[in-house]
């Protein structure tokens, strides 16, 4: 049997099939890569570890080696990779290097000639446009009274643009979750290969047993220490939920996700709010919810939470911003509402109209299976690693 070629996968997020969007996107990429390559996963811990929900057993099952690196020891990444390759039979070398997110790109570049040869294909998965990310986060910090932090985010935009401009020539392919981000960056940097790699969601392995859908249960899913989600939860609890409960005080707002902040904890005091926090399995949450709400007012990329709800046949109400980057149609796949009054009315419609829920979820499920499956990601990544892009130069040293 011919041994698999080797791929280095560098990510600051621990790949995991449930939880935050970045962890889920990284897990899909790793699953696809591991079907073709012996993958060496390197995770520099640039952010605090989330214990109890994310486990490295999933990564170890999908990799040939897994190295978790303390931020003070990132200089050890290349020697670790070289030592691993030296211990493999037949003069092992890297065929592909895949960097997940801009922050780890320099660490991946430093390994390009590990074991004495350059990788055939180099990929930088940007996920989203980080400059747009800063531009949208700054007003949220201003609204929270954090003017200094807002100013800092704006001051970083020029530096991030310069950093990206320096990184792009080193990679054959630059991946983005949003087709809109792809178009924007292609127009700015026509010499480089930007590839739309949509987020993907897995079909549930089995339905939630013994769980009945409650049409009056409103679900929010997301990382609860991510500023746009903090703003969205507070916006819904303060401005939308009271309007809903004026009409039907049996309606409840269930908040599920990893992490937590002071602003999230503060919404506990509102009538009808159920702050659940992290759960090991989202299948029962989607199965029991009458709807998922995505009341985002800022953010970038695409919303995996919407794709998950579509896969689980849970109706969705979202702001325009929340559904940004997804080729979905209001009234066909989900309901779009931007003012508190419109959003409350949409939630009340779903709670009382079974036929509407059925029409939306049937269309939404068919759409997500067609456009956001792991098979879609597999096809696109195979095209990337099939041959380097003619538009982007080979890695330099």
What function would you assign to each model-found segment?
Residues 1-65, 92:
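N-terminal subdomain of nucleotide-sugar transferases
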Residues 24-32, 187, 196-288:
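Conserved catalytic-core segment of nucleotide-activated headgroup transferases in glycan assembly
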Residues 122-162, 223:
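Acceptor-binding helix/loop patch of EC 2.4 sugar-transfer enzymes
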Residues 131, 154-206:
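Donor nucleotide-sugar binding/catalytic pocket of nucleotide-sugar-dependent glycosyltransferases
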Residues 287-301, 312-315:
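Acidic donor-binding loop of glycosyltransferase active sites
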Residues 305-309, 315-319, 335:
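Short hydrophobic beta-strand element within catalytic cores of glycosyltransferases
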Residues 334-341, 349-354:
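Conserved acidic donor-binding segment of nucleotide-sugar-dependent glycosyltransferases
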Residues 355-385:
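A charged, aromatic-enriched C-terminal amphipathic alpha-helix characteristic of glycosyltransferases
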């Amino acid at each position: 049997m011919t041994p698999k070629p080797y791929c280095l996968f560098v990510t600051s997020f621990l790949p995991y099939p449930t939880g935050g969007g970045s962890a889920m996107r990284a897990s899909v990429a790793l699953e696809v890569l591991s079907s073709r390559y012996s993958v060496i996963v390197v995770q520099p811990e640039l952010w605090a570890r989330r214990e109890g929900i994310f486990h490295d057993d999933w990564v170890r099952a999908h990799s040939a080696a897994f190295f978790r690196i303390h931020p003070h020891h990132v200089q050890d990444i290349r020697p670790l990779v070289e030592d691993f390759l030296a211990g493999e039979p037949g003069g092992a070398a890297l065929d592909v290097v895949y960097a997940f997110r801009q922050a780890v790109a320099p660490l991946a570049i430093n390994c390009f000639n590990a074991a004495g040869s350059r990788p055939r294909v180099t990929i930088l998965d940007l996920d989203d446009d980080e400059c747009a990310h800063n531009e949208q986060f700054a007003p949220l910090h201003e609204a929270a009274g954090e003017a200094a932090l807002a100013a800092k985010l704006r001051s970083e935009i020029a530096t991030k643009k310069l950093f990206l401009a320096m990184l792009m020539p080193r990679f054959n392919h630059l991946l983005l979750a949003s087709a809109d981000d792809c178009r924007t960056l292609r127009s700015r940097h026509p010499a480089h290969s930007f590839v739309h790699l949509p987020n993907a969601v897995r079909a549930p392995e089995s339905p939630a047993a013994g769980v009945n859908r409650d049409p009056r249960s409103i679900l929010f899913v997301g990382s609860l220490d991510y500023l746009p989600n903090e703003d969205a939860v507070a916006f819904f609890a303060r401005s939308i939920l009271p309007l809903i409960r004026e009409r039907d005080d049996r309606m409840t707002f269930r908040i599920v996700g990893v992490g937590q902040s002071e602003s999230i904890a503060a919404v506990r005091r509102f009538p009808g709010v159920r702050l659940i926090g992290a759960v090991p399995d989202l299948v029962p949450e989607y199965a029991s919810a009458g709807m998922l709400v995505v009341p985002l007012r800022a953010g970038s990329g695409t919303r995996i939470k919407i794709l998950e709800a579509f896969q689980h046949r849970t109706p969705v109400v979202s702001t325009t911003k929340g559904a940004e980057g997804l080729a979905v149609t209001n009234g066909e796949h989900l309901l779009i509402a931007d003012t508190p009054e419109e959003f409350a009315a949409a939630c009340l419609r779903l709670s009382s109209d079974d036929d509407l829920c059925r029409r939306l979820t049937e269309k939404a499920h068919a759409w997500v299976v067609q456009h956001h499956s792991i098979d879609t990601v597999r096809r696109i990544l195979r095209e990337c690693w099939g041959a380097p892009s003619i538009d982007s130069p080979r890695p330099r040293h």
